[in-house]
Amino acid sequence: MSTEEMWFPDWDNGGCKQPGVYMAGSPWSKNPASVRHYANSPHKLVQNWDTPILVTHGELDYRVPVEQGMSAFNAAQMMGVPSKMILFPDENHWILKPQNSIHWNREFFAWLDQYCK
C-alpha cells in the first residue's frame, strides 16, 4: 500500500521551498535546521520523561506505525514512568468504531481522573 502521506515528513522537514517558510530539511541533510530538529527528537529525550503516558494506537494506522507507539510505551516502562498502552486491532489513525470509541473514552477519562486530580 502506498500513500502520499509517506512524503509528509519530508514536506515538514524541508520539502517546502516557499521563501520565508521554515522547514528543517530531509532527515539525512546536515543543514543547521535539520540537525537542530533531530537533536530535539523525542527518542533522544526519553531520559527526561516523568509524566504518566497513555498510548492508544490503531494497529491499522499507516500514518504512525504501531511500532512507534509500542516504542514510546516500552521506553516509558523502562524508565519507570507510569504508562499504559491500549491497542485497537481494527482501527486506523483515529478510533472511530462506536464500541472502540466508548472503550477509548472510558480509558482516557479514567486516566485523567487518576493522574490529573
Predicted regions and their residues:
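Active-site-proximal cap/loop segments of hydrolase catalytic domains
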Residues: 1-117
